[in-house]
């Protein structure tokens, strides 16, 4: 089930959402153009949990200093075309409505805050991991958590596949996002979320999702009639 768009109009131009997508794409292109391909960016700017918790360098390529900066830089990097493609698709589908609700400036802070929370959740789940962590998935997951609070009944047009048969259909956001987070929790429960030996950082996704959900509840997201911000307001 792949979300393509939602039927949830906005009142502002989502310039921050677009800027975040552009920034991620630019960084990904720079990774590809690096002298060592993606490895150059991966080694320098990805986050390694062991280096955060122990303060010791474990990768052969010197990381940026100080090491905690990689908590931010890693969320603008990706490991491949599908990685960035799906992250940016989810951000485009769901991010504009959260930006519409919060305003441009607060949305940017919200996005970055969820990304940091996601990184810390991954560090907490596997503090001794020496596997580099990268990707916007945790920050985007925070957007999904916020969307679930605000618009659970919104219709999301999804691409569905049944064997060789493909179709699109409208699915309530609560089912789309509920299916997504249950999948993350199930995968993490299998023990693969720590990323000790590589793979997907499921606990980062989970941490980002619940950070976004809780923050939106604290910001009044459960009110029955959320107020819209004035167009262009920061």
What are these regions (language model features)?
Residues 1-234:
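A detector for small-residue-rich transmembrane helices and their helix-helix packing motifs
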């Amino acid at each position: 089930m792949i979300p393509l768009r939602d039927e949830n109009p906005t009142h502002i131009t989502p310039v921050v959402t677009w800027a975040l997508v552009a920034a991620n794409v630019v960084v990904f292109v720079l990774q590809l153009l690096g002298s060592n391909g993606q490895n150059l960016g991966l080694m320098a700017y990805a986050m390694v949990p062991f280096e955060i918790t122990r303060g010791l360098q474990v990768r052969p390529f010197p990381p940026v200093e100080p090491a905690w900066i990689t908590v931010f830089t890693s969320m603008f990097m990706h490991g491949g075309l599908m990685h960035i493609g799906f992250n940016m698709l989810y951000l485009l589908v769901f991010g504009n409505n959260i930006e519409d609700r919060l305003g441009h400036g607060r949305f940017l802070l919200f996005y970055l805050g969820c990304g940091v929370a996601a990184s810390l959740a991954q560090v907490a789940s596997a503090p001794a991991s020496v596997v580099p962590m990268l990707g916007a998935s945790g920050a985007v997951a925070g957007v999904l958590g916020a969307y679930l609070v605000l618009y659970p009944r919104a219709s999301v047009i999804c691409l569905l596949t049944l064997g060789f048969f493909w179709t699109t259909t409208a699915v309530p956001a609560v089912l789309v996002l509920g299916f997504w987070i249950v999948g993350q929790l199930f995968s993490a429960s299998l023990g693969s979320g720590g990323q000790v030996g590589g793979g997907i950082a499921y606990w980062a996704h989970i941490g980002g999702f619940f950070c976004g959900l809780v923050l939106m509840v604290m910001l009044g997201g459960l009110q029955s009639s959320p107020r819209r911000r004035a167009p262009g307001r920061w």
